[in-house]
Amino acid sequence: MVRRNIELCFPDLTAAEHDALVFRHFEALGMMLIEMGLGRWASDKHLESITKLTGIEHVTNALESGNGVILLSAHFTTLEIMGRVLSLNMPPFDAVFRRNRSEFMTELQRTGRERSAEFTIEKRDIKKMVRSLRKGRAVWYAPDQSYNRKGAEVIAFFGVPAMHTTATSTLARLGNATVVPFFPRRLPDSTYELILMPALQDFPSDDATADTRRYINLLEQHVRTCPEQYFWIHRKFKDLPADYPDYYADLDASK
């Protein structure tokens, strides 16, 4: 799965370079377990000593103006530790989580998010997200994984067709919210950087697909800076319409 996703997204790499990136990704997955522990149990002082936060003013300025804020992120192996760091530097916020087939994994994710966020919201509960935004709160939202329900569109990721939800545009409109993209990464010296970008201007537009493409473009740019830390273990290119390729058919057949 990991190798297939990497091959699709980085076709210009050699086979040896694919192998190296796959290996580095599994190293990042191993580090993720440690980072989850740091996010849950490390002291505030220790976390502040190993992290750098840039752009927090983009969030605080929006909140001070009375707007809700969508903290628009994505699934990186470093995300849980950075959620905790974010919580040390801004007013309490809410975090969206995805219900997993495994109840254990659902609770692991939910309780981990609760270490950072004041409240958690299941990702299908759009009404609850909108209510929170209308109250002038911030909501941490990562809508990059494959989505096959109403409101999904085929939008390329690294040039490969993928199903993406267009809900960010809807949330911003209904919640009258400012959208601030933020992405984390682990640096070569084993410290961490959390980058909060300037609020998206003219967002949402009247084209939810174009809005989503703006987000995907930003995500791709960040992935290129730390490709081993994106969550390649997820089936990013599943659930495409029938007239698109099944990128995992041979993997499924070999099970």
What residue ranges belong to the model's regions?
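Membrane-anchoring hydrophobic helices of lipid-metabolizing enzymes
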Residues: M1-S73, L108-T111, A117
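Non-catalytic C-terminal accessory region of glycerolipid acyltransferases
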Residues: D19-F26, N61-E64, L88-P91, K123-K255
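Catalytic core of membrane glycerolipid acyltransferases/transacylases, capturing the structured
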Residues: R24, M31, S65-R124, K135, ...
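Hydrophobic alpha-helical segments typical of transmembrane helices
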Residues: V2-N5, M82, L108-Q109, D125, ...
